């Protein structure tokens, strides 16, 4: 390996994979809603996996869920796929 090349880990020791997944979920949700300041995520690491609860303004909950649940289904699919990559199950819920 050349002296000018460095190998770095993309996650710090303090940051859990579930935190990185939650950051991505928050980024997606903030892009969907009108009131970004009302968006908050509660991440709970459980024995069986991770639960990410999305709280947003009541008027924006429909935008996060989407017509026939398409938006939240897509968000769940992305979060679960990332969770599988790190060996964890991830569930996403909207509290509205």
Where are these regions (language model features)?
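RNA-contacting regions in translation and RNA-metabolism proteins
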Residues: 1-60, 74-96
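Glycine-centered tight-turn and secondary-structure capping sites
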Residues: 65-69
């Amino acid at each position: 390996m050349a002296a000018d090349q460095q190998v770095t880990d993309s996650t710090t020791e303090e940051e859990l994979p579930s935190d990185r997944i939650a950051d991505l979920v928050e980024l997606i949700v903030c892009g969907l809603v009108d009131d970004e300041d009302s968006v908050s995520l509660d991440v709970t690491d459980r024995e069986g996996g991770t639960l990410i609860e999305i709280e947003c303004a009541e008027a924006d909950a429909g935008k996060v869920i989407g017509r026939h649940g398409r938006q939240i289904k897509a968000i769940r699919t992305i979060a679960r796929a990332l969770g599988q990559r790190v060996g964890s199950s991830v569930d996403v819920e909207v509290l509205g």
